[in-house]
Amino acid sequence: MIQKDLILLLLICLTIISCRTPRFVYSPAPPNNPYFRERGESKLAAYYSTGADANELTNEYNNGFDLQGAYAVSDHFALTADYFKRSEKDGIYEDNRTYFDTSLVRYKRRLTSIGAGYFTPITNDRKITMNIYGGLGFGKYSFSDDGFDNGAGYHRDYSSDMTKWYIQPSINFFVGNYFRTGLISKVSWVRFNDIETSYTSAELSYLDLDRLPGRTLRFFEATWNVQVSFRNKNWFYLDGGFTFSSDPFVNDDTNLEARNFNASIGISLDLSKINRKNNEQ
C-alpha cells in the first residue's frame, strides 16, 4: 500500500513539473567565425536564421536575421561586429497547470556585439587555421504573454536589458579553392538587468523568472559552418550552418531554458578580394 502511495505521489510531482512550461531566456545565433589567414581580409555577412520549431497549426514561429562583419588588422589579429534579432511565438494549450491554462508567448530579442580575436595557420600549406575570438554585447530581451487563466483572459509583459560576453575557439578547414568549413565552440555569459514586468511575484516564482534579476547565466554552443564559393567569384560565398545550445548551467534545479537549435543560411562577402582582383587587372 505504501509503495502504491509513493508511486502515485511521484506521478503527481512529475505531472506538476512537466506542466510548468518555461519562458525561454536565451536563443543561439550563428557565430561570427571569419576564415582569415592574412592581413586585409574582410567579412560582410547576412543570414536568415530559424529555430526549425515552427508549427503552422498553432501559428508558432522562431526566426530572425543576423548581420556580421570582420576585418583582419594584421596577419594574426582581427576585429568583429555583429547584430542579432529574433521573433518567436509559442502556443501553450493545457488546462491542468497552476497558472495560465492557455498561453501565447511572443518573444523579441536583439543584441549588438563587438569583439576581437587571434587567428593563425597550423599547417604548412595553411589549409587549417586555429582561431579564438571574444566579445561583448548589449541588447534587449522581452516577451508578451496572453491567454486564459481559470477561464479569464490575462495579459503579461516582461522585458530585460542583456549584457553578454563570450569566448569562441574554432578550427577552420580550407578544402580546395571553393569550399571551407569550420567547427566552432562558444561559451557565453548573459546577465539580465533593469527588468520590468507585469507578472505577480507568485507568477514570477512559478516560472522561475524571479531568479533572473542581476544574475549571470552561462551557456555552451557548438556550431558546424560551411561556406561554398564559385569560379571567378571567390569573393562571394554561400554560407550556412547549424548551432546547438545548452540550457543554462546552474547549480540548482530550475525551469529556465534556452532554445537549443538554430539553422542559418545566407551570404558572406570578402570585399578585399574584389579590390585585389581589380588591382591585378
Residue ranges and their predicted role:
Residues 29, 55-60, 90-99, 141-153, ...:
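Outer-membrane beta-barrel translocator domains and adjoining extracellular loop/strand segments
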Residues 48-54, 83-89, 120, 134-142, ...:
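Transmembrane beta-strands of outer-membrane beta-barrel pores
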Residues 206, 210-281:
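Predominantly the C-terminal beta-signal and adjacent terminal strand-loop region
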Residues 58-120, 135-138:
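Glycine- and aromatic-enriched membrane insertion/assembly motifs of diderm outer-membrane
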Residues 44-46, 69, 79-81, 114-116, ...:
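Membrane-embedded beta-strand positions of outer-membrane beta-barrel proteins
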Residues 19-72, 78-79, 270-272, 280-281:
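Short glycine/proline- and aromatic-enriched beta-strand/turn motifs that initiate or cap beta-hairpins
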Residues 75-81, 123-129, 177-181, 191, ...:
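Repeated loop/turn-to-beta-strand initiation elements of outer-membrane beta-barrel proteins
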Residues 38-42, 59-65, 85, 106-112, ...:
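Residues that define the transmembrane beta-barrel architecture of outer-membrane proteins
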